[in-house]
Curated annotation (Swiss-Prot):
Organism whose genome encodes this protein: Homo sapiens (Human)
Predominant cellular place of this UniProt entry's protein: nucleus
SMART domains given in the database record: KRAB, ZnF_C2H2
Disulfide bonds: none
InterPro entries per the UniProt record, alphabetical: C2H2-ZF_domain (IPR050752), KRAB (IPR001909), KRAB_dom_sf (IPR036051), Znf_C2H2_sf (IPR036236), Znf_C2H2_type (IPR013087)
Expression by tissue: Expressed in lung, liver, pancreas and thymus. Lower expression in heart, placenta, spleen, prostate, ovary, small intestine and colon. No expression seen in brain, skeletal muscle, kidney, testis and peripheral blood leukocyte.
Gene: ZNF284
Pfam family, one: KRAB
The protein, known as: Zinc finger protein 284
Species lineage: Eukaryota, Metazoa, Chordata, Craniata, Vertebrata
GO BP annotation list: regulation of DNA-templated transcription
């Protein structure tokens, strides 16, 4: 047996694993690794190894995860020493550093028997090592040349470890889960995965009793209770409780988006974001609500939806004690308390915290629509609305109702349709109890109770509750009639009036009387007809006291008393005393068409 003549240093007997390889060790293997490292260190101290600054180790209290990193060689190749550090991922407890001398003081009392000490002659070129290494851990033997990987130039102490590492580059996946068919490079990673779907959760949090399948998951979870954030961004100083969170955050500074969707070319910072985005193209909705059966692309959307059923408002404002179902809604609300509203609308006096919100609000008063469709010329306030509108021309639909199969150009329309399909009214007015399928419709309805009329006409000063009302009203001043009937060429100020008019040409009568089966073109005439069956007379003349079923009959009576011709034809401008006379003229005209 060839004996060594030169001094033995700690690097000569150090166990070296990469961070990736150490991440695959289970609890028992990590403990074994720690014991081997300490045993080697004790052996060096026992043979009189001289301490130096380069031999300093960094230990942390309650360490569970050890990483050995070999730093760059700081001295020349001729006899230079290599600095090594034993690091750990911090879990709980404050940081604490022990020097070699302190470790020696802690372990010297254990080295009482002569056989506990070893001499440098006990280390041979064949790599005689303590028995703890038999579990598969490799020692860098004195005089051995480490194995180098050709692609990343990474060095490994053992050829078997190099072979495992090469699987990361080659994509070779040899270990498959029989239940989920998920594949792994390492058998240890497969074992960890199998614990997850087997339901084995041995590690329990002492604070909240939450259980985990891996000890590392428990230690990461405990940072929520301790508030520890050991991973800090060097750019902005922001701290994170997870290393992965810091990596994702750092890409915000670099602008790196390495994960690209092959369907639409959109790029993402994280691979999980790409996978979630791809579900839009595939239509996959793996997260299903067990209450109503509705499915979602992401778990976060399911969690937000679940709050609707539970009526849970877990996010409370500390200033006014108002509660919200989502954190984003709470953050937006808190800005109303903390930020000064410097930007005031001159039209209605409403104030805003930022200029952008003021500019958006002013479009309600001006009716400005800078984004025009190249196909039909329709204008929109926002580019996003124009993009959604263009789907109508392209025939692109993004949402399909599971109940009736109807397709929609916008997800919001589809969700509103499904709520109406299920008669689901999620938003209720606290004043009158009326329910709505969307919060936007509820906000519009509440103006009826508050009397708010934020939209004022500059021509006549008339106020309106909704932007659509003032837009229709402005056409009375301008005389604009943008909606034209293709059958007869007649134009209208509103699209709804055009649709009603087209029923004259199509003969459509969607409103039918349940008593006699008679059909009507409009809901108003249907209601008027129903009063004939109920004998209800709601309209009474103040001059003679006579009651009528129709408001038109009341108007005719009042015209008889006053002699005024109140019924005017929109086509020729001629006036009639009775609405009935005008209707007869119009019917004759339509029969001639």
């Amino acid at each position: 047996m060839t004996m060594f003549k030169e001094a033995v240093t700690f690097k000569d007997v150090a166990v070296v694993f990469t961070e990736e390889e150490l991440g695959l060790l289970d609890v028992s293997q990590r403990k074994l690794y720690r014991d081997v490292m300490l045993e080697n260190f004790r052996n060096l101290l026992s043979v009189g190894h001289q301490l130096s600054h380069r031999d300093t180790f960094h230990f942390q209290r309650e360490e569970k995860f050890w990483i050995m990193e070999t730093a760059t060689q700081r001295e020349g190749n001729s006899g230079g020493k290599i600095q090594t550090e034993l690091e750990s991922v911090p879990e709980t407890g404050p940081h604490e550093e022990w020097s070699c001398q302190q470790i020696w003081e802690q372990t010297a009392s254990e080295l009482t028997r002569p056989q506990d000490s070893i001499s440098s002659s006990q280390f041979s070129t064949q790599g005689d090592v303590p028995s703890q290494v038999d579990a598969g851990l490799s020692i860098i033997h004195i005089g051995e040349t480490p194995s180098e990987h050709g692609k990343c130039k990474k060095f490994f102490s053992d050829v078997s470890i190099l072979d495992l590492h090469q699987q990361l580059h080659s994509g070779k996946i040899s270990h498959t889960c029989n239940e989920y068919r998920k594949r792994f490079c390492y058998s240890s990673a497969l074992c960890l995965h199998q614990k997850v779907h087997m339901g084995e959760k041995r590690y329990k949090c002492d604070v909240c009793s939450k259980a985990f399948s891996q000890n590392s998951q428990l230690q990461t979870h405990q940072r929520i209770h301790t508030g520890e954030k050991p991973f800090k961004c060097e750019q902005c100083g922001k701290s994170f409780s997870r290393r992965s969170g810091m990596y994702v955050h750092c890409k915000l500074h670099t602008g790196e988006k390495p994960h690209i969707c092959e369907e639409c070319g959109k790029a993402f910072i994280h691979n999980s974001q790409l996978r979630e985005h791809q579900r839009i193209h595939t239509g996959e909705k793996p997260f299903k609500c067990y209450i109503c059966g509705k499915s979602f692309h992401s778990r976060s959307n399911l969690n937000r939806h679940s709050m609707v059923h539970m009526q849970e408002k877990s996010f409370r404002c500390d200033t006014c004690s108002n509660s919200f179902g989502q954190r984003s809604a709470l953050n937006s609300h808190c800005m109303d308390h903390t930020k000064e509203k410097l930007y005031k609308c001159e039209e209605c006096g409403r104030s805003f915290t930022c200029r952008q919100d003021l500019c958006k609000h002013q479009m309600d008063h001006t009716g400005d629509k800078p984004y025009n469709c190249n196909v039909c010329g329709k204008g929109f306030r926002w580019s996003s609305c124009l993009s959604r509108h263009q789907r109508v021309h392209n025939g692109e639909t993004t949402f399909k109702c599971d109940g009736c199969g109807k397709r929609f150009y916008m997800n919001s329309q589809g969700h509103s349709h499904q709520r109406a399909y299920r008669e689901e009214e999620l938003y209720k007015c606290q004043k009158c109890g009326k329910g709505y399928i969307s919060k936007f419709n509820l906000d519009l309805h509440q103006r009826v109770h508050t009397g708010e009329r934020p939209y004022n006409c500059k021509e006549c000063g008339k106020s309106f509750r909704w932007a659509s009302g003032i837009l229709r009203h402005k056409r009375l001043h301008t005389g604009e009639k943008p909606f034209k009937c293709e059958e007869c060429g007649k134009r209208f100020t509103e699209n709804s009036k055009l649709r009603f008019h087209q029923r004259i040409h199509t003969g459509e009568k969607p409103y039918k009387c349940e008593e006699c089966g008679k059909g009507f073109r409009w809901a108003s005439t249907h209601l008027t007809h129903q009063r004939l069956h109920s004998r209800e007379k709601l309209f009474q003349c103040e001059d003679c006291g006579k009651s009528s079923e129709h408001s038109s009959c009341l108007q005719d009576q009042q015209s008889d008393h006053s002699g005024e011709k109140t019924s005017k034809c929109e086509d020729c401008g001629k006036r009639y005393e009775r609405r009935l006379n005008l209707d007869m003229i119009l019917s004759l005209f339509l029969n001639d068409i």
